[in-house]
A protein has these predicted regions:
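Short acidic/polar inter-strand loop motif in beta-rich domains
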Residues: 515-521
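Periplasmic OmpA-like peptidoglycan-binding domain that tethers envelope proteins to the cell wall
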Residues: 615-687
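Extracellular beta-strand solenoid repeats
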Residues: 96, 122, 147-149, 161, ...
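N-terminal, post-signal-peptide segments of secreted/periplasmic proteins
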Residues: 26-223, 244, 367-369, 378, ...
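Short glycine/acidic-rich loop motifs that flank beta-strands on beta-rich extracellular proteins
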Residues: 156-158, 178-185, 236-247, 268-274, ...
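All-beta strand scaffolds that present successive hydrophobic residues in beta-strands
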Residues: 121, 168-170, 226-228, 257-260, ...
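Periplasmic peptidoglycan-binding/anchoring modules of Gram-negative envelope and division proteins
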Residues: 572, 579-613, 640, 677, ...
């Protein structure tokens, strides 16, 4: 008998047995009571931080979920627990919290039951929750009190799993949920995971993987899920938890999910990641900070069906890759009015990377990116992407970069390919992002001011809308597009004219063109604005901002003014830490060195650091580049745990390519195995080359 036929026979036997038990009264009555409980909609108050299902003196979160799901009946509770259950007055069941003051951390050792019915899990009901007291100045995010985490030393893949429509998760701190990454045959780990019932789908339903989503009609994605006012990956005291979660919110298969006013930080992977379906997704007013530390590096990663998705009003800062990365999506998304700053800390990647068509990137502030601003891929075909009214500054690349000629190297999928030549063939329409719409060209390299006005003229693709931008930095020949100062249209011959106001001598301008049929262009070559006498004062440099993602709330009383220093400040700080042979973890001695560095960084918030990983020359170049990167990552994670803002720390690996010395002794190799800290600040920093944490391998040691 084949395995498939045997399974079918066994299933039929089980079904017959269940029918016989039903006929002769052999089934327990608990499921009947449970279904009655579901139909009546319950309000359950969690008053115990334990993780058990038993009749005792306290009602646990695990019991509360089972009660609202209908898998646990009220009559199985103790007399002390029953008063915690009542009929809900709202449209759905509700799980509230009244935990003892010193017992607000719920530690679970196994997966909690799926949220299989409409329910509100409301951590704001816990005594002491202060909704009107924001923890940071940037967004109205109140600190939660109730914490949900995995028991220390255990792998629990998910904090809460949503498989039902109309589920709300509110006011919780959820962290420490990850999995054994050596095992690939598991559902994705996350603080909150949203999918249809029984994820993942039973892939035995089909023998050969299909090109479409491997789901049947009964795999219905949950609708109208709301995730709000939670802190994911971060504790209520704003510290990094001992175990970091894999992902924040994984929208595996859902429609109409809203993620708003959450602080999502410190994850190994992305803060928000989608997979099969996430149409009508709304991600708004969240602080997405310091994610991607050991896995998927992007703050928000959108894949699958993302039609009508919106990413609006978020602070996206200090993440290891892109702020927002769209990977081969179906449907169009809006990325609007976000602060996308200080990203690309581990991978030098675009702040926003677009694949696909008809996306809109508008009104964003994109700054301090270790890569370009917005990149549009050439493959898969990507066009009609509108990129307008954004403000760019402090980039390592173009404000807008359209990848051309089907360039598909790793570099192209991270940083683009820099400025394109003008379109010289109809084939460029086929192999370039946004169908190779040409960047505008000014008719002159400089324009004469009349007072504070200048008439700017140029040429662009006919019929396109041209936006003119002020350029406040002198880093690139094309942009950055700092501030929009006007817009006009190109006529049928491609000519455009704009009288721009409010300009000063020595300022520069650039431009972009947008055609609804093709999308937005790369920036024009900058032009200078000057007076007729050619006296052009140098532009005033923009002062450097303190590199921080979040700040404490604004004080009610004005701070005492700080008297500026009249003499340069000299700081003494170590510039390197060392590692053992073939290791990437921080030794106890190296930790003491990093503690000294962290103290200096805490006392001097203007300093930013590049962490450069190095190895000795043994092993292959590729292996050593990876080892150097892992050492830099370990150093960065240690400093973040000491409270250093991730926006201040970038990493780079040189592997064996920059040795300390050319010798081949054990001492030489020990000096090579290091992370160098490159400090950047306007003040005078005296760096100390220290060797107190050198780790020399034993004689005869091998890798």
């Amino acid at each position: 008998m084949s395995k498939q036929k045997g399974n079918r026979v066994n299933g039929e036997r089980r079904l017959i047995a269940l029918l016989l038990l039903t006929i002769f009264g052999g089934l327990p009555t608990t499921p009947v009571l449970a279904q009655e409980a579901v139909s009546s909609r319950l309000r359950v108050v969690v008053n115990s931080d334990q993780d058990s299902v038993q009749a005792d003196g306290g009602l646990t979160l695990r019991e509360a979920i089972a009660l609202v799901n209908g898998t646990l009946s009220v009559d199985r509770l103790s007399e002390a627990e029953k008063p915690q259950v009542s009929t809900a007055t709202g449209a759905t069941s509700e799980i509230a919290f009244q935990l003892p003051t010193a017992q607000t951390v719920i530690r679970v050792s196994t997966l909690l039951p799926d949220l299989a019915v409409p329910v509100v899990i409301d951590g704001t009901t816990q005594t002491g929750y202060a909704a009107d007291t924001p923890a940071i100045a940037e967004l109205p995010l109140a600190a939660p009190i109730v914490e949900l985490t995995a028991t220390q030393g255990t792998f629990v893949a998910r904090g809460l799993t949503v498989v039902s429509d109309n589920v709300t998760i509110r006011g919780l701190s959820i962290y420490g949920f990850t999995d054994d990454h050596d095992d690939t045959a598991r559902t994705p780990p996350a603080d909150i995971f949203i999918a249809h019932r029984l994820p993942p789908p039973d892939i035995s339903k089909q023998k050969i993987p299909a090109n479409s989503s491997p789901f049947y009609s009964d795999d219905i994605p949950p609708k109208n899920v709301l995730i709000e006012n939670n802190w994911l990956g971060i504790r209520p005291d704003q510290s990094v938890p001992p175990t970091t979660s894999a992902f924040g919110v994984s929208v595996f298969n859902s429609t109409g999910t809203t993620i708003r006013r959450n602080w999502i930080a410190n994850h190994d992977g992305s803060a928000v990641i989608t997979s099969v379906r996430s149409d009508n997704l709304v991600v708004t007013e969240n602080a997405i900070v310091g994610n991607g530390m050991a896995g998927m590096p992007d703050g928000i990663r959108l894949e699958g069906n993302i039609d009508k998705a919106q990413v609006t009003g978020n602070l996206i800062c200090g993440n290891d890759g892109a702020g927002v990365y769209l990977f081969k999506p179906q449907g169009a998304a809006q990325i609007r009015d976000n602060q996308i700053i200080y990203n690309g800390r581990r991978y030098r990647r675009a702040a926003v990377y677009l694949m696909g068509n008809d996306h809109q990137v508008t009104g964003n502030t994109i700054a301090h990116q270790a890569g370009p601003g917005v990149v549009v891929a050439s493959f898969p075909r990507s066009s009609r992407n509108t990129i307008e009214s954004n403000r760019f500054s402090s980039l390592e690349g173009l404000s807008i970069d359209l990848v051309t000629q089907d360039n598909v190297s790793v570099h192209d999928y991270q940083r683009g390919d820099d400025i394109n030549p003008r379109r010289n063939s109809p084939n460029r329409r086929k192999d370039t992002g946004n169908a190779a719409i040409n960047a505008p060209e000014f008719t002159a390299r400089d324009f004469i001011l009349s007072g504070t006005q200048a008439q700017l003229t140029g040429k662009a693709d006919s019929g396109s809308q041209v936006q003119i931008y002020r350029v406040t930095e002198g880093t690139f020949a094309h942009g950055p597009l700092s501030e929009q100062i006007g817009s006009t249209s190109a006529d049928s011959q491609g000519q455009f004219t704009l009288t721009a106001s409010g300009l000063q001598p020595g300022e520069r301008v650039s431009a972009i063109a947008t055609d609804p049929k093709y999308g937005t262009s790369e920036p024009a070559l900058n032009a200078l604005v000057r007076t007729a006498d050619a006296a052009t004062p140098a532009p005033i440099p923009t002062p450097n901002a303190v590199p921080r993602c979040t700040n404490p709330p604004v004080a009610q009383t004005p701070p005492v003014p700080v008297v500026p220093q009249t003499t340069p400040i000299v700081l003494k700080v170590p510039k390197n830490v060392h590692f053992a042979l073939d290791k990437d973890f921080i030794s106890l001695t190296s930790a003491k060195v990093l503690d000294r560095i962290a103290q200096v960084l805490s006392e001097n918030p203007n300093i930013v650091v590049e962490l450069q990983g190095h190895t000795d020359p043994r092993a292959s170049d590729a292996y050593n580049l990876d080892l150097g990167k892992r050492r830099a990552i370990s150093t960065r994670k240690y400093l973040i745990r000491q409270g250093i803002d991730p926006a201040r720390l970038t990493i780079r690996s040189f592997g064996e390519r920059q040795r300390i010395a050319d010798g081949d002794t054990r001492l030489d190799f020990a000096r090579d195995r290091r992370v160098e800290l490159i400090y950047k600040d306007a003040r005078n920093i005296e760096v100390i080359v220290q060797e107190e944490d050198l780790q020399i391998e034993p004689a005869g040691g091998v890798r």
